[in-house]
Amino acid sequence: MLEIENFSLSYGEGEPVLQDITLSLKAGECLVVTGESGSGKSSLIHAINGLAFHYNQGVGKGHIRFEGESIETLPIYRIALQIASVFQNPKTHFFNVNTTLELLFYMENMGLDRAKMDRRMEDLLKIFPIEHLLGRNIFALSGGEKQILSVASCYLAGCKLIVMDEPSSNLDEASIAVLKKMLPMLKERGIALLIAEHRLHYLTELMDRLIFLETGKIARAFSREEFLSLSEDVLADMGLRSREKPVLHVSAWKNEGELTVETLCCPFRRGEELKLSQVSFSFGKIYGIVGENGCGKSTLLRAMTGLETPKKSRITLRGKPLSGRERISRSALVMQDVNSQLFTDSVEEELLLAWKGRCLREKTDGKIREKAAEEAAQREIETLLQALGLAECKERHPMSLSGGQKQRLALATCLLKDANFFYFDEPTSGMDRKNMLRIATLLKQQQREDRILFVVSHDTAFLQEVATECLDLETFRKRTAGARN
């Protein structure tokens, strides 16, 4: 079905992002592709679905064929009829506001009649328990719900191959269980799967083979049996996540401290409200915020920072009320979709921009001591780049980075800010073990007596490393009259 022989991929005059790739994939097979962030996983997927050639001006050497035809020369609409894609950022999939219309949109573009569309929808709902997502506003979905909708759309397209780029990166364990249940059913229907992934625990029973990419090359290849025989120490040396499902063991939330949410009421999706009362947080701690997809975690962060106006709120610091404006000025936030937080033409410029924002507040006698400040900033920026493994990327455009590299860059810009309250929304989504541990180390270094850090995450292994206490937001989600069951 898919044949790749001695294939290399380059963009412009830069170094190849893929080198001498040779692999094959048959109908009903599952190939897992893993490796450090920036190792070429997304580039391989973009080569297979044709985006590297048709949209990114990539230049290929060697052969990449699907059912005997060269993907480089096939029109993009022909590729789309055979190969479906699930991207790291599910927002790039959507063309409609309504979720049901979005699912139908794929089939409408293929020219299917109404009866065939109905049959496919019925078949979909037998595989995917996603009735609760139908008829919803896409913009009201959580990141994980959007990803599930993307996978469902790919199934409806009726393609022979589905390529997935970090499909579990924003999913909670319940949503991963849905994905884990659905993928074998796709295999049974003869659909081939190529999955680029860091979380491996839910794929061990599904995979037929696994390849490990390193700097754009296939460094190692394993059958399922060979991969399962590797020790945890070997996996750690390779920078891979554990095969075992992680379990969170951190202290429960103690509800004490200087920052208090005396009352907070936020409508966050159809018929539901997030309600907190007398919830306190202490300086010098890192709070993990957990809960299933769609329970209001991102809404809580936006309300806490002052970016979202709740229906009702009173937040105090040592007993004194903090207005929304005050919270904005004292907060730094890394959002789930970091693409909306990157503005400049290079990694280094992005960090300098964050530093200049801090300088607006750091004045001496009404003036900024520019030379000394710039030298200090350059040292701080270099330290951050080294700590996050981005030193070699400092001249690159932020939009050319991998998803994990963008996450680390956004986190670095956040840490350069002069803030008391730091909020991180899924900071390790789509991130390998090595870089996850880098971020955990860096966040623990930020624990100071004048700072509180909040981390929303489904990454249990990361929370195990970094969180001092955890708040389960499921406790505070309240359904109003008429809410869906």
What are these regions (language model features)?
Residues 172, 432:
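ABC-family nucleotide-binding domains
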Residues 197-198, 457-458:
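H-loop/switch region of ABC-family ATPase nucleotide-binding domains
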Residues 57-69, 313-327:
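Conserved ABC transporter NBD signature motif
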Residues 154-155, 415:
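ABC ATPase C-loop
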Residues 137-141, 145, 397-401:
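Conserved ABC ATPase signature
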Residues 115-133, 369-393:
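Conserved ABC ATPase "signature" region
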Residues 162-165, 422-425:
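Catalytic Walker B motif of ABC-type/P-loop ATPase nucleotide-binding domains
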Residues 49, 305:
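Helix-to-loop junction immediately C-terminal to a conserved catalytic motif
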